[in-house]
């Protein structure tokens, strides 16, 4: 319970009255009388406030939120007595808020609805500990703070908003939405789809001469990309993925991009799975069907990168034991020169059965360090260190390419498009 401004004003007026009494303008008993009146009013108001029932509060918010996506939250308050309150929701994790706190006047029989926006900053499970109200007493002499239910547990998932947007488009259109450059091939692929009349632009090898002779017109065979192939996304959750760009860790960027390419693979009729390595390990067996997206989200929403070294060879061994069918294995990490021997041994093991692609995330700061002007000795030292690091990084990538590994050297924001392009290229070329 805290004094309200009105009580403070009354106390200041009482103190000023004391100066008048000391000057002899008023009798001493008048000062004591005013003190008694103010004290009695304050105590009565305090007693009345303590007996007032708390408002009823309801929170309108889904239990699933997306990382980094602003969400509107609704609060609904009802009371049996008129009262003035200040409302603040106890949001977890120190997430950024807009439009809180708010002051509202509650009236009996009328529900008061207010809204604010929040932006989750971390994946995982979190709890809203309640709604905090500062309630003004009936005579406006006190502010009382009360914490009321409802408690609410929420899950913050990787950013699934692009996936809901992709559902409105075909696989090719969704690929273009993430920036992937799709090469269209009409009627070509590895699986027979149908017979149809010849169209301008069809290749001669598509012509079916027996069907043409029977129909007495040109008939083409139409093929499509093979379906029911396997995609396994290996995500490094070790120390290499702790770097942060754009408010998200490299691991978050990798996870978001992996969900995008997995979604598109499922739309193409393929099976998609996930394997987190480095920190806490999670395995989702490649499965077909759009319901797999929910499995991937639930398996990965609380994964966090850990400050530990990633054992690539142990991870590759586990993949070899678990994933018996040939698959496109996409490893997303931040490849360093000191990791290359272990990584080379891992990809050699994987290549005995699988097609391997390594996506190596590159920090934006490295590009800026080389492009910036050099004016001081410190600038020169930073540029030299960045150049040496990039040289070692390129050397590591070349070592992987020498083993016939597909290597993607990309920044975090370009990762979704790069993964989608590579996946579609593998499908187009029939490499699986």
Annotate the PLM regions.
Residues 335-341:
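Active-site glycine- and acidic-residue-rich loops that bind
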Residues 357-367:
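Short, flexible loop segments at boundaries between secondary-structure elements
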Residues 36-291, 326-331, 345-349, 359:
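An amphipathic, basic-hydrophobic helix/alpha-beta surface used to engage anionic
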Residues 1-58:
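Extracellular/lumenal glycan-associated context and N-glycosylation machinery
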Residues 294-296, 365-395:
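Acidic, Ser/Thr-rich peripheral helices and adjacent loops at domain boundaries
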Residues 292-328:
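Von Willebrand factor
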Residues 388-429:
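C-terminal helix of von Willebrand factor
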């Amino acid at each position: 319970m805290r004094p309200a401004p009105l009580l403070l004003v009354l106390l200041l007026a009482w103190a000023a009255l004391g100066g008048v009494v000391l000057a002899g303008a008023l009798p001493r008993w008048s000062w004591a009388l005013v003190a008694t009146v103010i004290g009695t009013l304050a105590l009565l108001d305090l007693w009345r406030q303590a007996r007032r029932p708390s408002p009823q509060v309801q929170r309108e918010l889904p239990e699933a939120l997306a990382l980094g996506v602003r969400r509107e939250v609704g609060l609904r308050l009802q009371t049996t007595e008129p009262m003035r309150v200040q409302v603040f929701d106890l949001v977890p994790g120190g997430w950024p808020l807009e439009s809180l706190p708010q002051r509202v006047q509650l009236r009996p029989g009328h529900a008061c609805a207010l809204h604010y926006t929040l932006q989750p900053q971390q994946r995982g499970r979190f709890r809203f500990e309640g709604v905090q109200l500062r309630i003004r007493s009936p005579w406006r002499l006190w502010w009382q703070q009360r914490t009321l239910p409802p408690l609410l547990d929420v899950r913050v998932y990787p950013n699934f908003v692009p996936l809901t947007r992709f559902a409105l488009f075909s696989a090719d259109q969704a690929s273009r939405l993430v920036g992937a450059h799709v090469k269209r091939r009409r009627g070509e692929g590895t699986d027979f789809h149908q017979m149809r009349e010849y169209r301008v632009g069809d290749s001669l090898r598509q012509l079916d001469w027996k069907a043409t002779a029977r129909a007495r017109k040109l008939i083409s065979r139409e093929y499509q990309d093979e379906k029911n192939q396997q995609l396994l996304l290996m995500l490094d959750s070790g120390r290499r993925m702790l770097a942060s760009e754009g408010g998200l860790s490299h691991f978050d960027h990798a996870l978001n991009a992996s969900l995008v390419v997995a979604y598109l693979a499922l739309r193409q009729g393929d099976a998609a799975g996930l394997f987190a390595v480095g920190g806490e390990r999670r395995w989702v067996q490649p499965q077909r069907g759009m319901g797999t997206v929910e499995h991937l989200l639930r398996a990965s929403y609380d994964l966090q990168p850990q400050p530990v070294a990633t054992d690539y060879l142990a991870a590759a061994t586990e993949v070899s034991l678990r994933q018996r069918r040939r698959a496109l294995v996409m490893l997303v990490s931040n490849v360093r020169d000191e990791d290359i021997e272990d990584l080379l041994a891992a990809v050699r093991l994987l290549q005995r059965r699988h097609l391997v692609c390594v996506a190596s995330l590159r920090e934006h700061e490295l590009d800026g360090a080389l492009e910036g002007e050099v004016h001081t000795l410190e600038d020169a030292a930073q540029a030299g260190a960045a150049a040496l690091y990039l040289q070692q990084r390129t050397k590591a990538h070349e070592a992987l390419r020498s083993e016939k590994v597909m290597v993607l050297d990309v920044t975090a924001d370009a990762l979704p498009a790069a993964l989608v392009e590579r996946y579609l290229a593998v499908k187009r070329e029939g490499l699986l």
